[in-house]
UniProtKB/Swiss-Prot annotation:
Organism expressing this protein natively: Amoebophilus asiaticus (strain 5a2)
Protein name: Chaperone protein DnaK
Encoding gene, per UniProt annotation: dnaK
Region called Disordered, residue ranges: 597-632
Induction (record text): By stress conditions e.g. heat shock.
Modified residues (Phosphothreonine): 199
């Protein structure tokens, strides 16, 4: 069995790890960094090259509307759900079929799954470069509070990227697995506080005898580092607006500069009590350039984000209640996600749990490490570890009067299966609609629809007589399968809730083919750039050699070398790869002739220099002899 890599597909950054022997290893990308920005950029309105990771992030200021970041916020979401979130990004979002979200780039649109697949492809390539072999399987992490549609969308992104997703696991659970692997024989209860770029999760786990059991989970999929940045962006923009009467948020380039400056200031304020935002030439008013220069203290920043910090505490209380524990029962608190570096967050966590959080894990890497360990469990490399995860939200169906009837409660350990018998609501009813929902509200309309299907062919009977058995089956990824069976006729209808993310199997297959084609195109683009760079270096070297050897070689050899170099220059300017290959061969052949001619010229000079010295030597010998004879 090949390696199963572990991928933390984050809102802001992504990370990949793999088991090597008994140890998980975080793999550095081609730029030598252990995390990769979850950013995809399209050049020339989508007609040019595509960049992923650091290269995409670096060009964001000059290309904000075609640079996609924080795509995780839109995974599995309906367009009607994203009104607020769409304001946080500079790129254009559109409504697709079935109220799905689409990203507009030039003359085409992409699904969030396709954009995420591009990031996953980058992580896959990073792992393949390190391992020296093709990677086909992965464990991918998701926020614990992701619903069915969001989990399914993540799985689809993996498929589009050419990965068989062996398991979807919750980020806090992965972090606990990484933290507790060397403590698996200890009995302990841990809280994982996970505040990332776009989501917040809190999970309570119990460890003992190699079993990692999630007792409860809670969270907020609309709360993360992006929101903290946004508070700073709004403050800076409002301060500038007071002084200059211009709203910088209406200019995509200025907004992107503000966004990057806010993120940088937030990070700096974790280590110092004050920082300065300095953005020269942020805009021009009546042709006069304007600069934004603002000092901000940590106290001011904490005041701005106080509401966000407090929003993390309610899920913590709920998770503790659901686990049936008090803070005194918690042995260790683990901080996960870059946003937990904010001192105010650390203070509030310490205050809530009445203990200092553990500093024993790297918050940026621990989730990928846990995913790699789970990959090792699946391949058999990691033994004596059992992971028992839970579903974050209840599953159920709509029943008479628009009531939401739960079949499987939140925080139920997965995999799990539950059946319940329902009946018809009217006499002679021959068909029933099964409306599958996820959520915690009492009425169906207030919960999230994740699928609908019909069971037809029910024999006519008075209401309440037919026996319809509805079965919910949740797999280890937290993804739901539903079936409905008429117990009288044995007729059954099944549905795998996959359409909840808005993509059919056929669409996924097509996107996978496109992704593979793009991967090939990207590879060819890289090869083209490499070839152009090699040609450029060859031209430089050849000209240098020609200059150095010019006087020592015959005119015809020199002329053929100059012609070959000129041909390569033209091919390089035209970016004609076939012509470059031909011209490179000619230049290399000409260089060989140059070296050979220079060598011959050198040998000829050497012989010429040697002959006079020999005759001089003879003359001296003769003179010496004569003189000697004369004295004698």
């Amino acid at each position: 069995m090949g390696k199963i890599i572990g991928i933390d597909l984050g809102t802001t950054n992504s990370c990949v790890a793999v088991m090597e022997g008994n140890e998980p290893v975080v793999i550095a990308n081609s730029e030598g960094k252990r995390t990769t920005p979850s950013v995809v950029a399209f050049l020339n309105e989508g007609q040019g090259e595509r960049k992923v990771g650091d290269a995409a992030k670096r060009q964001a200021i000059i290309n904000p509307q075609n640079t996609i970041s924080s795509i995780k916020r839109f995974m599995g979401k309906r367009y009607s759900d994203i009104a607020e979130e769409s304001k946080l990004v500079p790129y254009q979002l559109e409504k697709g079929n079935n109220d799905t979200v689409r990203v507009r780039i030039g003359d085409r649109t992409y699904t969030p799954q396709e954009i995420s697949a591009m990031i996953l492809q980058k992580m896959k390539t990073t792992a393949e470069d390190y391992l020296g072999t093709t990677v086909k399987e992965a464990v991918i992490t998701v926020p614990a509070y992701f619903n069915d549609a969001e989990r399914q969308a993540t799985k689809e992104a993996g498929q589009i990227a050419g990965l068989e997703v062996k398991r979807i696991i919750n980020e806090p659970t992965a972090a606990a697995l990484a933290y507790g692997l060397d403590k698996k024989n200890q009995d302990m209860k841990i809280a994982v506080f996970d505040l990332g770029g776009g989501t917040f999760d809190i999970s309570i786990l119990e460890l003992g005898d190699g079993v990692f059991e999630v007792k409860s989970t809670n969270g907020d999929v609309h709360l993360g580092g992006d929101n903290f940045d946004q508070k700073l962006i709004d403050w800076l923009a409002e301060e500038f607006k007071k002084e200059e009467s211009v709203d910088l948020r209406k200019d995509p380039t200025a907004l992107q500069r503000l966004k990057e400056a806010a993120e940088k200031a937030k990070i700096e304020l974790s280590g110092s009590s004050t920082t300065e935002v300095n953005l020269p030439y942020i805009t021009a008013i009546d042709g006069v350039p304007k600069h934004l220069v603002k000092k901000i203290t940590r106290a001011q920043f904490e005041q701005l984000v106080d509401g966000l910090v407090r929003r993390t505490l309610e899920p913590c209380k709920k998770a503790m209640q659901d686990a049936g524990l008090t803070v005194a029962d918690i042995d260790e608190v683990i901080l996960v996600g870059g946003s937990t570096r904010i001192p105010k967050i650390q203070e509030e966590v310490e205050k809530f749990f009445n203990k200092k959080p553990s500093k024993g894990v790297n918050p940026d890497e621990v989730v990928a490490v846990g995913a790699a360990i789970q990959g090792g469990v699946l391949t058999g490399e990691v033994k004596d570890v059992l992971l028992l995860d839970v579903i974050p939200l209840s599953f159920g169906i709509e029943t008479l009067g628009g009531v939401y009837t739960k079949l499987i409660e939140a925080n139920t350990t997965i995999p799990t299966k539950k059946s319940e018998v329902f009946s018809t609501a009217a006499d002679s009813q021959s068909s029933v609609e099964i409306h599958v929902l996820q959520g915690e509200r009492a009425m169906a309309r207030d919960n999230r629809t994740i699928g609908k299907f019909h069971l037809d062919g029910i024999p006519p009977a008075p209401r309440g007589i037919p026996q319809i058995e509805v079965t919910f089956d949740i797999d280890a990824n937290g993804i739901l399968n539903v079936s409905a069976k008429d117990k009288g006729t044995g007729k059954e209808q099944k549905i795998r809730i996959e359409a909840s993310s808005g993509l059919t199997d056929e669409e996924i297959k097509k996107m996978k083919q496109e992704a593979e084609a793009n991967a090939e195109a990207d590879k060819q683009e890289r090869e083209k750039v490499d070839k152009l760079n090699t040609a450029d270096a060859t031209i430089f070297q050849a000209q240098k050699q020609l200059q150095e050897l010019g006087d020592k070689i015959p005119a015809d050899t020199k002329k053929s070398a100059e012609d070959a170099i000129e041909e390569l220059k033209k091919a390089h300017e035209a970016k004609d790869i076939a012509a470059i290959d031909t011209a490179m061969s000619k230049v290399n052949a000409a260089l060989q002739q140059l070296y050979a001619a220079a060598q011959q010229a050198g040998q000829a000079e050497g012989q010429a220099a040697q002959e006079p010295s020999q005759s001089t030597g003879n003359a001296q010998a003769e003179a010496t002899d004569a003189e000697y004879e004369e004295v004698k």
